A protein has these predicted regions:
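C-terminal capping/lid segments that line or modulate ligand- or cofactor-binding pockets
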Residues: 257, 325-326, 532-533, 538, ...
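A carbohydrate-recognition surface predominantly in extracellular/luminal proteins
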Residues: 18-34, 144
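Extracellular/oxidizing-compartment recognition motifs
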Residues: 1-18, 37, 50-77, 94, ...
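Short tryptophan-centered beta-strand motifs in secreted/extracellular beta-sheet-rich domains
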Residues: 27-29, 83-95, 99-103
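Ligand-recognition surfaces built from glycine- and aromatic
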Residues: 120-182
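Alpha-helical support elements that line or immediately flank enzyme active sites
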Residues: 204-213, 218-219, 404-423, 469-472, ...
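Active-site acid/base region of carbohydrate-active enzymes
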Residues: 212-213, 303-311, 476-512, 518-519, ...
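Non-catalytic C-terminal accessory modules of carbohydrate-active enzymes
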Residues: 276, 285-287, 300-334, 357-359, ...
């Protein structure tokens, strides 16, 4: 369809930007008022800057609901400036926090007074929305103009445009009387095309896509129940389009096709790198192909005949920050209405420009939707919890989920409601939102006065269990709220794995693992669904891939993400380096990251092992090969990092020059309780594993020369690993974190000959090796067979000396239990699984978790304290990687041939479990496995 998409990209008739990225702007107007209240930098009616222009002074205030602190609202005076004469025109220029205000051409303010952004809180220093607060006063406005860097965002005669929504309009003047209204100068894009049908339709199909999110409608009805189309890709290189059968939606005579565009990841916030990463403005492309019963056909496509308006209900929208919907601005898309003007033709997507260098043979492409679109998969009914603080009404949907809400309310026209979301509550019932960092995560609904009104945000996504309903610039009563439902949205909906055992906490853990997967497998496999991040972290995905494939059918979803990963490697354009996130986003280490970039080999391999589709390996082989070659290129040495007193510094140990040692950028065993495992150690272990996967892949694909090459490479890395860290007695030892505060150190000679003191980790010393160090070495088959028996002893000790508690982080989590079982330590694995004290898998379960936490100590129930807000998600699937062990070992379901064409059943029992049962639906059918212990007897049942 790509070559046949003969249509224009259309949007606003003028150039636009995202006002949440505009910190340099100008507002001008003429006015008549004794007390003008000009509002700017407005996130909503409780968070804004007010320029109060009175008869004899101008006062500037910051108004805030202070939600990220103590919920005590404040109105802070930023400055008062006296004037001596009457004024009727203003020109306000803002540059970040500096204010330059002219009244009738006379400078009144030139001060740096506006509030600054605060780390890990919603942004303040941007234009966002503007308006007028004329409560208990009146103002008459004309010639209102809003611009940034000579780009006019709004200039209205108040006849039919967006700014007319701020008040009542007559004769080119806007009157605001005892009212407070704000609008985003660049709201959603609304498009329509009216046309007639005069023949009998045989079939009709709509093809559509957008730069940004879109909702398409025929005659006012959505063409599907999808959310967030066209999905998330690297929009510089590839955008998906969707296909809809709309045969039954068209009518005889008059028809209209319409679309509403939101910013999405295209021009909205994307990761924590800011807004407009891919582009500045949303645009839409579509073709409606109609076939008539007489054999003729007609194509209605996006072109200059379409109409545009920005005076519409969705006045603001961001996937991270939330959606604002004003029901008073709803319209009939078929009706004649002065608000509609000619649309703008937007530039066709350009040849992709990569992050590094240039690409000579890569073109932008529109590709068909791969896998399921995002849809509502479950409705959770909210229950009222408490009112705290006053007029803040908190509801619990019962499950930490990802998606949106369905809110039913009643009230007067113009009343406005603010909806905030949290994963947890404080002990007093107030929602916990500090872990959202700068993501406002807030929706706004303004009522039109119907008996019952329903609001479902469609362009914003939230990760939440708790919903707080409050007034937006006003107080509301609980009676206004009829119901609050949580709508869980995901791209995956087919359960393939079931597990149950005699321990209800472990059963709840399995529930939490699955719901963490369902929620985060939305558009891409995100790390978390709630804060200003939500990126496709490669490290998270590679540790969870096997668990994810047991739980749910993720074949097409991950197949699409592997396209994203290939695109990310292409657009990163760094000699085969794989960036940390796909699609390519912010915070990518300069030269690829061990344990993260290895997703390029691990995820395709896990998908092939589960589904047996050789096309996965064929598609990914070049990516896999480029990554492994990049890892082992000679110029990679000395590019690595390690930690010094908790801070990252360049790796300069004596190992840095040894061939096959992976001295590279690495995040190490992220969020571990034992940070001793050197980055250089985990990176080398993963490099060996990637080489091992690649040699097996080469064998399957019949690439004999490559198989030989990568077999030798694996053996060489394994040998280097052993020489560096494996002792004759099977234990491992290493120089870990550099510190001046250690009691037991060793010395290492740097490249320049200087001596550095490193903490030395070895058995029978004050500092012992980590659980992760042993887990990686064992699970990646890096320990020689003649040493493995002794390694088993030391591996066991790494668990027991921590009282049967976990210390692993992200890189060790998926390998710990499998490695223990590999060396016959099933009893230790069960001990870890059944541990209930922190850190453990069951600690969060005991304390009410319904998904997997990012940290072992995201919340400490004993003290009621939360973890570090800079990184404290309560829906982070990585630590749920233990789930694979439920299926492979407790149930004993393992493939012998790829795709489970043949398989083995080898269940294990242990710990305090008296029964376990479950199943896995493979490509060849359902496999069930169940065992129980009763009166000392073991009974096993299986069904295939």
């Amino acid at each position: 369809m790509n070559n046949e998409f003969n249509a224009d990209w259309i949007g606003s008739p003028q150039e636009t930007v995202n006002t949440y990225a505009v910190d340099n702007y100008k507002i001008s107007c003429t006015f008549k008022s004794d007390n003008l209240g000009l509002v700017a930098n407005a996130r909503n009616k409780d968070n804004y800057v007010l320029f109060n222009i009175g008869k004899d002074s101008v006062s500037v205030y910051e108004i805030s609901d202070n939600a990220w602190n103590d919920n005590v609202q404040y109105k802070k005076l930023l400055g008062t400036f006296h004037v001596t004469e009457h004024f009727d025109s203003l020109e306000l220029s803002v540059n970040k926090t500096n204010v330059l205000l002219y009244l009738n051409g006379q400078k009144v303010i030139d001060e740096d007074i506006l509030p600054k952004n605060i780390i890990n809180q919603p942004r303040k220093t941007f234009l966002m929305s503007v308006g007028f607060n004329q409560l208990n006063s009146v103002a008459e406005i004309s010639h209102l103009k809003i611009e940034t860097n000579n780009l006019v965002l709004q200039e209205d005669n108040f006849e039919n445009g967006l700014l007319s929504a701020l008040g009542t309009c007559e004769n080119g003047k806007l009157t605001i009387n005892n009212a407070f209204e704000i609008v985003n100068p660049v709201p959603s894009v609304n498009l329509r095309k009216r046309f007639n049908i005069e023949k009998t339709i045989k079939s009709a199909r709509l093809y559509a896509s957008a730069q940004g999110f879109y909702n398409a409608c025929i005659n006012g009805e959505k063409v599907s129940d999808d959310f967030y189309n066209p999905g998330f890709t690297d929009y510089r290189l590839r955008i998906q389009y969707q296909t809809f059968d709309v045969t039954d939606m068209l009518a005889d005579g008059k028809n209209v096709i319409s679309a509403v565009l939101g910013r999405g990841h295209y021009s909205g916030f994307c990761g924590y790198s800011g807004a407009m990463i891919y582009g500045k403005e949303s645009s839409f492309i579509a073709m409606l192909n109609i076939v008539y019963t007489d054999g003729t056909s007609e194509v209605i496509k996006t072109d200059s005949s379409w109409e545009f308006t920005d005076k519409a209900p969705i006045s603001d929208c961001d996937y991270f920050d939330g959606e604002s919907y004003d029901a008073r601005l709803e319209y009939n898309p078929l009706a004649d209405d002065k608000r509609w003007v000619k649309c703008g033709i937007k530039q066709q997507p350009k040849k992709p420009v990569p992050t590094n260098g240039t690409l000579s043979d890569t073109d932008f492409k529109l590709t068909a939707q791969k896998g399921n679109t995002a849809k509502i998969i479950k409705n959770f009914v909210g229950k009222f919890v408490c009112e705290n603080p006053k007029n803040h009404f908190v509801y619990d949907v019962g499950q930490n989920m990802v998606g949106t809400i369905k809110l039913k309310v009643k009230g007067q026209c113009g009343q406005s409601i603010k909806i905030r979301y949290g994963e947890m509550t404080h002990k007093d019932g107030c929602i916990y939102i500090k872990n959202l960092r700068s993501a406002a995560n807030t929706d706004i609904y303004t009522l039109c006065g119907r008996d019952t009104e329903e609001f479902i945000p469609t362009f914003a996504s939230h990760g939440f269990r708790y919903v707080e309903i409050i007034g937006n610039g006003c107080d509301i009563s609980k009676d206004m709220v009829i119901s609050v439902d949580g709508l869980a949205i995901s791209n995956i909906d087919t359960v393939t794995g079931e597990f149950e055992c005699s321990n209800p906490l472990i059963n709840r853990l399995q529930h939490n693992i699955r719901w963490g997967e369902i929620g985060n497998f939305l558009l891409i496999p995100t790390d978390c669904p709630q804060r200003n991040e939500r990126m496709g972290w490669t490290g998270d995905m590679q540790v969870f891939a096997k668990t994810g494939a047991y739980n749910m059918n993720i074949k097409s979803f991950i197949d699409k993400w592997l396209d994203d990963l290939i695109d990310a490697q292409t657009m990163y354009n760094k000699n085969g380096a794989v960036p940390d996130t796909a699609p390519l986003g912010g915070d990518n280490r300069i030269d690829g990251c061990g344990g993260w970039g290895d997703a390029a080999t691990i995820v395709p391999w896990e998908m092939y092992e589960t589904y047996g589709d050789i096309r996965i390996l064929k598609k990914c082989y070049d990516m896999m090969k480029k990554w492994v070659e990049y890892q082992n290129s000679t110029d990679r040495r000395n590019y690595g990092v390690r930690t010094v007193d908790g801070k990252e510094v360049p790796e300069q140990s004596d190992l840095a020059t040894i061939p096959y040692i992976q001295v590279q950028q690495c995040r190490g065993d992220h969020l571990t309780y034992d940070n001793s495992t050197p980055y250089i150690y985990s990176a080398t272990a993963y490099a060996a594993h990637s080489a091992d996967i690649l040699r097996r892949t080469a064998y399957i694909l019949g690439k004999t020369d490559d198989e030989k090459r990568y077999t030798e490479l694996f053996e060489n890395i394994k040998r280097a690993f052993n020489d560096a860290w494996v002792n004759d007695d099977g234990s491992v030892s290493y120089y870990g974190e550099v510190s001046s505060q250690t009691a037991h150190c060793g010395e290492s000679v740097a490249l320049d000959g200087s001596v550095t003191r490193y903490t030395y980790y070895a058995e029978n010393t004050p500092h012992c090796p980590s659980q992760t160090a042993y887990a990686l070495a064992v699970d990646f088959d890096l320990i020689p067979q003649d040493k493995l028996k002794n390694t088993r002893k030391y591996f066991k000790n790494s668990i027991l000396r921590n009282n049967g508690k976990l210390t692993v982080g992200f890189l060790g989590i998926s390998h710990l239990a499998p490695a223990l079982s590999k060396v016959g330590l099933d009893d230790v694995a069960f001990k870890l699984l059944e541990q209930e004290d922190n850190p453990s898998w069951l600690y969060s379960v005991k304390n009410g978790a319904t998904t997997i936490w990012e940290r072992w100590n995201s919340y400490i129930a004993e003290t009621g304290t939360f973890g570090d807000v800079s990184m404290n998600s309560f829906n982070h699937y990585s630590y749920g990687a233990i789930g694979q062990w439920f299926f492979t070992d407790i149930l004993g379901i393992r493939p012998v041939e790829f795709g489970y064409k043949s398989f083995m059943l080898a269940p294990k029992f242990g710990g305090g479990l008296t029964y376990a049962k479950g199943s896995f639906t493979s490509p060849y059918g359902k496999i069930s496995s169940a065992w129980k212990l009763h009166d000392g007897k073991f009974t096993y049942d299986c069904t295939v």
